[in-house]
């Protein structure tokens, strides 16, 4: 979708690129991925960081971060609402093989919210469903690598991680820190 590409760059394309196999990827939908609230969902991780809203038939319009934490029900997802605002968006994931589920998936978004610079961090495949962290950090554009690494460490440490056959909780936290640092560095290098 050109509107999403204009708003988010190549981040959304990156989050759907790894969906297992061409046949499945051509049938998968953004709505189905978000409604399912799957722990391995790249799409949920990306849209959660974009401060997205969902419109439900019975539940009305609520933030995606609230919807993710609701118990599964029989409500119908009508639409997904992404705010159109000037923000920088990055998404990345680590996989053991190209078409495997992610070991960890991270998304970082920054922009002005109510006059304050706000950073949104979403980490999925922890192996729990994606979670969102919001920070009002004013990071200088010329921030040093050490300063960015400290911010990334702090953000990654505020998520809960678990272990399964793809990796331990400690391994996932380390990977999340690395991905968050890379994404923050990329955003700061591009300029806001």
Give the predicted meaning of each segment:
Residues 1-192:
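C-terminal structural segment of proteins
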């Amino acid at each position: 979708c050109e509107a999403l590409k204009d708003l988010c760059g190549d981040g959304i394309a990156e989050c759907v690129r790894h969906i297992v196999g061409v046949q499945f990827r051509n049938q998968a939908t953004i709505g189905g991925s978000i409604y399912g609230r799957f722990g391995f969902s790249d799409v949920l991780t990306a849209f959660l960081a974009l401060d997205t809203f969902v419109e439900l038939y019975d539940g009305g319009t609520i933030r995606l971060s609230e919807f993710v934490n609701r118990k599964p029900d029989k409500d119908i997802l009508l639409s997904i609402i992404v705010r159109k605002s000037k923000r920088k968006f990055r998404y990345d994931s680590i996989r053991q093989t190209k078409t495997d589920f992610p070991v960890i998936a991270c998304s970082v978004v920054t922009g002005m919210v109510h006059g304050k610079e706000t950073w949104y961090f979403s980490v999925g495949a922890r192996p729990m469903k994606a979670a969102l962290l919001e920070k009002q950090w004013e990071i200088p554009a010329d921030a040093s690598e050490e300063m960015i690494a400290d911010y990334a460490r702090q953000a990654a440490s505020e998520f809960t991680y678990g272990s399964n056959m793809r990796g331990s909780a400690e391994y996932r936290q380390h990977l999340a820190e690395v991905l968050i640092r890379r994404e923050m560095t990329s955003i700061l290098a591009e300029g806001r």
